[in-house]
Amino acid sequence: MAPSRKFFVGGNWKMNGRKNNLGELINTLNAAKVPADTEVVCAPPTAYIDFARQKLDPKIAVAAQNCYKVANGAFTGEISPGMIKDLGATWVVLGHSERRHVFGESDELIGQKVAHALAEGLGVIACIGEKLDEREAGITEKVVFEQTKVIADNVKDWSKVVLAYEPVWAIGTGKTATPQQAQEVHEKLRGWLKSNVSDAVAQSARIIYGGSVTGATCKELASQPDVDGFLVGGASLKPEFVDIINAKQ
């Protein structure tokens, strides 16, 4: 990892937790040592964004797990970037594979969400990744490049964007991409950014890995030159998340 790219660890709590056990998790995180050269962001369920922001130490930022593409309107059940900011969160996760595959979100919709969230001043953790059949068909690059292009077309300022590579076959399955597999895709993504955005963005943009990251797998993954951090699911609800935060130490 280039020294200019600050290590980034996001915890995606998904649809888990209640105030009592999330409060315990927050106490654990507040007591944890967060290295000065590591940025930590937690994404609680929407209902608990306010609770998490009030309880979490300021050293840990808060993200929403999703948002809609406009500021207000007749969109029952949705939340806008302006509302997310109003609750004290500063980031949003967009394009997560569960949004793509469980809820049928298209590349186009995700791109529109990215554009609106950035315009409203949120940082964006933009997720991309191939399914198992796509990897086995040898089209990993094609898939992730197409997804990245739609995101890139909607980004003016890359300093507010973290790209999260999440091979769908490794999310919640216990299967982790090997450090070499992760590095290979991250390196190719950086090459795509160099060719299609700019060399400066390719050097500075953080590309993080998600997909069954645990305390046991994080150190070797973090040692890869193009892996700039993690987006962590299940393990972010456990004390081992502290080990992942310290993966570079």
From Swiss-Prot:
UniProt modified residues of type 3'-nitrotyrosine: Y68, Y209
Do the record's keywords include Metal-binding?
Answer: no
Q: Where in the cell is it found?
A: Cytoplasm
A GO CC term assigned to this protein in UniProt: cytosol
Q: Which residues carry this modification: N6-acetyllysine?
A: K14, K156, K194, K238
Q: Where is the active site?
A: H96 (electrophile), E166 (proton acceptor)
Q: Which GO terms describe its biological process?
A: gluconeogenesis; glyceraldehyde-3-phosphate biosynthetic process; glycerol catabolic process; glycolytic process; methylglyoxal biosynthetic process
N6-succinyllysine: residues bearing it: K149, K156, K194
Phosphoserine is found on S80, S106, S159, S198, S212, S223
- EC numbers listed for it are 5.3.1.1, 4.2.3.3
- Cross-link position, Glycyl lysine isopeptide (Lys-Gly) (interchain with G-Cter in SUMO1)? K142
Q: Where does the chain bind substrate?
A: N12, K14
This molecule's function is given as: Triosephosphate isomerase is an extremely efficient metabolic enzyme that catalyzes the interconversion between dihydroxyacetone phosphate (DHAP) and D-glyceraldehyde-3-phosphate (G3P) in glycolysis and gluconeogenesis. It is also responsible for the non-negligible production of methylglyoxal a reactive cytotoxic side-product that modifies and can alter proteins, DNA and lipids.
Protein name (record): Triosephosphate isomerase
